[in-house]
């Protein structure tokens, strides 16, 4: 929803007529139904740009991620139903499902049905391992049924920058005194620990780093069997920088920093330890709740844009 809202803000001239046409063609639809029709149309349009890569790479690259309704974060059945609908929109769709307790269930079901997932709203090692295990169960079910999995490319996003953000909020809220800059390593520490476990266990699911805040979120992950979704402005900065491009994925986060985060911030401890959270605790983790609230708010802003098309404000001249 956030990305769709950003696209509309920049390219409304490209979508205004399409929105009006959707509304006119479906006179009984609610603003939510119109909003999702628009989201799907945007996703299909964007996916076409990647089809050549998708075909060349036999489905392992060239996918377009489309996010399930953030309001469904507690409902595995609705996440699964919507995810499978999205998978049918184009051959190269990647289905974004939150790493909530219900989302973990949906990830297994969507994977078992043959769709590639992108787990989102994920910040902790425990969440990332639950995602990888769910994907493994789904793939095993397909294998047992004799169904092909060779073109599937599931990923689990750890939102490294948003975990850093949450550490900053906790430090300020709880008046925790630590060295300046330590919180900027929190996401990397969790990511690198999860990566080590992924490599050890040989998971088919791959880790993806998202939510960039500084160059370490790129430079410290160079050389890994990972996916980096680097926004264009950050790409330009990194390309023009003098940061040496060398393999660092196996370089541990400085021990003194990890020790400080671990000893001072309880929310870091549960994010860093593989058994730090149970699945039942995923939804209540601070970064999870904070991000879900933001995604839902962005969705409501998108719906408000659609509302202005359907019910223009009579208090102002158009």
List where the protein language model places each region.
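Glycine-rich, histidine-containing beta strand-loop boundary motifs that form or position
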Residues: 1, 97-99, 119-123
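Catalytic alpha/beta core domains of metabolic enzymes, predominantly
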Residues: 116-248
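C-terminal extensions of enzymes
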Residues: 247-318
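Active-site beta->alpha loop and helix N-cap motifs at the rims of alpha/beta catalytic domains
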Residues: 3-5, 10-107, 112
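Hydrophobic alpha-helical scaffolding
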Residues: 36, 40, 121, 180, ...
């Amino acid at each position: 929803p956030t990305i769709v809202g950003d696209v509309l803000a920049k390219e409304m001239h490209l979508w205004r007529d399409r929105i009006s046409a959707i509304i006119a063609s479906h006179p009984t639809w609610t603003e939510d139904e119109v909003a999702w029709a628009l989201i799907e149309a945007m996703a299909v349009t964007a996916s076409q740009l990647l089809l050549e890569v998708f075909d060349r790479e036999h489905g392992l690259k060239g996918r377009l991620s489309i996010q399930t309704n953030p309001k469904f974060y507690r409902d595995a059945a609705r996440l699964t139903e919507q995810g499978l609908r999205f998978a049918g929109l184009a051959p190269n769709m990647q289905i974004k499902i939150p790493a909530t307790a219900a989302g973990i269930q949906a990830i297994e079901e969507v994977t078992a049905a043959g769709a590639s997932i992108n787990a989102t709203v994920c910040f902790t090692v425990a969440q990332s391992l639950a995602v990888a295990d769910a994907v493994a169960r789904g793939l095993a079910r397909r294998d047992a049924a004799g169904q092909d999995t060779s073109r599937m490319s599931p990923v689990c996003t750890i939102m490294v920058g948003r975990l850093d953000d949450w550490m900053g909020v906790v430090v300020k809220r709880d008046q925790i005194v630590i060295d300046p800059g330590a919180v900027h390593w929190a996401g990397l520490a969790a990511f690198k620990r999860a990566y080590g476990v992924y490599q050890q266990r040989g998971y088919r699911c791959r880790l993806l780093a998202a939510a960039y805040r500084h160059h370490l979120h790129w430079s410290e992950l160079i050389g890994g069997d990972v996916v980096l979704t680097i926004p264009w402005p950050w790409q330009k900065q990194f390309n023009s920088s003098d940061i040496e491009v060398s393999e660092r994925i196996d370089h541990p986060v400085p021990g003194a920093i990890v020790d400080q985060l671990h000893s001072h911030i309880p929310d870091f401890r549960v994010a860093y330890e593989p058994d730090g959270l149970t699945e039942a605790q995923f939804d209540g983790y601070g970064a999870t709740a904070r991000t879900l609230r933001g995604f839902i708010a962005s969705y409501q802003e998108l719906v408000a844009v659609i509302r202005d098309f359907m019910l223009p404000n009579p208090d102002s001249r158009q």
